[in-house]
Regions:
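Intrinsic-disorder/low-complexity, polar/charged segments enriched in Ser/Thr/Lys/Arg/Asp/Glu/Gln
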Residues: 1-9, 15, 51-53, 65, ...
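Short amphipathic alpha-helical segments
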Residues: 13-19, 133, 137, 141
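Conserved catalytic core of Hanks-type protein kinase domains
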Residues: 20, 30, 72-73, 136
Length: 163
C-alpha cells in the first residue's frame, strides 16, 4: 500500500515528545483503541531494538497479530518502526514518526504508515477498506497522544512484558 501520513500538533517541546515516543511501552497508551493485548518483546522498552507484539482489532481481520521494532532512532527528529502483520506475518509494516518544531514550544508530529502486502488477497483486503480504517485509527491515536502529553488525559495502560 502506498504510504499515508497523518499529523497533529502537540503543545510540548520536541525533545519531550520524542522521549515519550522512544519508549515503545508508551505506544499502548495512545493506540489501545485499535491495538489490543500490547506486549513488549524485551525488557528494555526504550530506543533502537525495542519492540512489541499486539492484536490489530480491525473488522473482518482473521489474522490479527502483528509486531513492530524500533529500527531507526534519531533524537529528537525521527523514529522508525518496522514489523510484520497478517497470516504467517507475511505483510511488512513500516511506521515513521517525524517531529518538526512548531511555533512557540509546539511540535508537529507526522506519522507515516506503509504496508507491503505479500499476496493478491492481502492487497484486496487493503483496497476493501483496511487502508482507510488504519488512517482513521492513526489520526485518532495522534489526537490521543496530544491529549496525553498536553493534558494528561485519555491515558491508557502502558505495555508490559509478554509472559
Amino acid at each position: 500500500m502506498d504510504p499515508f501520513t497523518v499529523t497533529a500538533t502537540v503543545a510540548r517541546p520536541r525533545e519531550e515528545v520524542f522521549e515519550y515516543l522512544a519508549d515503545i511501552a508508551n505506544h499502548a497508551e495512545f493506540t489501545d483503541h485499535f491495538l489490543k493485548d500490547f506486549r513488549l518483546t524485551r525488557e528494555q522498552s526504550y530506543g533502537r531494538g525495542a519492540g512489541a507484539r499486539y492484536r490489530v482489532n480491525m473488522p473482518l481481520n482473521r489474522f490479527p497479530w502483528a509486531d513492530t521494532t524500533i529500527v531507526e532512532f534519531d533524537p529528537p527528529y525521527r523514529l522508525v518502526e518496522e514489523g510484520r502483520a497478517g497470516k504467517y506475518n507475511r505483510i511488512k509494516v513500516s511506521t515513521e514518526y517525524r517531529l518538526l518544531e512548531g511555533a512557540g514550544d509546539t511540535t508537529r508530529v507526522e506519522l507515516t504508515s506503509e504496508t507491503e502486502p505479500a499476496l493478491v488477497t492481502d492487497r484486496l483486503l487493503e483496497k476493501l477498506g483496511a487502508r482507510g480504517w488504519l488512517r482513521r485509527q492513526n489520526r485518532r491515536a495522534l489526537r490521543r497522544l496530544r491529549s496525553i502529553l498536553e493534558d494528561n488525559e485519555l491515558r491508557g495502560r502502558r505495555a508490559t512484558l509478554a509472559r
